[in-house]
């Protein structure tokens, strides 16, 4: 909330300084530049369709379950077209809401293909997402619970997208894109809730993020995979080094 407020104030300050028309013109130009840059990079991927699948693991109701889901990627004309499908939605919080699916689709694209391209609407213009038939774990409908969409089904979407992009990069004629191929990010964590009495004598609860991001990353062509890594959807998360 604080970041959104600060960002809004700075945009208003820019509008006051340069005028709304100038700001909109430059913003549109920047979006077009990002779109052109990503389209050019996608065009260096081999045309065609690739597919993969994953499972969402969940045992919150006492019985270990595996919920299968699928992904298909078509690269053509500078555009990445994704189609997802999965089993019918379930009465637990793993169902993938729209934000969880779309956010976890674009995160691997940002770190693997658009790592040096400014992120704005122009990036989204190069990506089409089809979540398939309503009523599944990738396209749930009310009253499906979705409070952990980003870390459950969403995280598996990120794993599938990174696999598809790595496969496409490996088959590219571009040495730059071939160097972007990488192993899987963990996209998993051991979630824990810590609680106790704080120094004021009140109950305190917190969720440490170390187990979500302080994990060895995947092997890459330019690194050995021993960096601090975790969910691909947490691109800039920080935690205290204590």
Locate each region found by the language model.
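Glycine/proline-enriched, intrinsically flexible loops and inter-domain linkers
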Residues: 1-242
């Amino acid at each position: 909330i604080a970041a959104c407020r600060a960002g809004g104030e700075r945009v208003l300050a820019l509008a006051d300084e340069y005028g709304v028309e100038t700001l909109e013109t430059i913003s549109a130009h920047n979006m077009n530049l990002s779109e052109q840059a990503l389209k050019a990079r996608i065009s260096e991927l081999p045309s065609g369709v690739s597919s993969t699948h994953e499972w969402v693991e969940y045992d919150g109701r006492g019985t270990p379950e595996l919920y299968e889901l699928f992904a298909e990627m078509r690269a053509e004309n500078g555009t990445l077209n994704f189609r997802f499908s999965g089993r019918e939605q379930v009465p637990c919080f793993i169902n993938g809401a729209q934000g969880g699916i779309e956010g976890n689709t674009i995160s691997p694209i940002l770190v693997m293909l658009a790592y040096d391209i400014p992120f704005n609407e122009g990036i989204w213009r190069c990506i089409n997402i089809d979540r398939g038939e309503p009523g599944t774990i990738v396209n749930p409908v009310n009253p499906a619970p979705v409070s952990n969409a980003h870390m459950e089904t969403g995280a598996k979407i990120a794993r599938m997208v990174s696999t598809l992009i790595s496969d496409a990069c490996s088959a590219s004629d571009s040495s730059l894109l071939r160097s972007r191929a990488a192993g899987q990010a963990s996209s998993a964590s051991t979630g824990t809730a810590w609680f106790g009495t704080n120094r004021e004598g009140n109950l305190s609860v917190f969720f440490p993020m170390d187990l979500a991001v302080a994990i060895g990353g995947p092997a890459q062509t330019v690194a050995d995979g021993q960096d601090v890594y975790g969910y691909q959807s947490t691109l800039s998360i920080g935690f205290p080094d204590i």
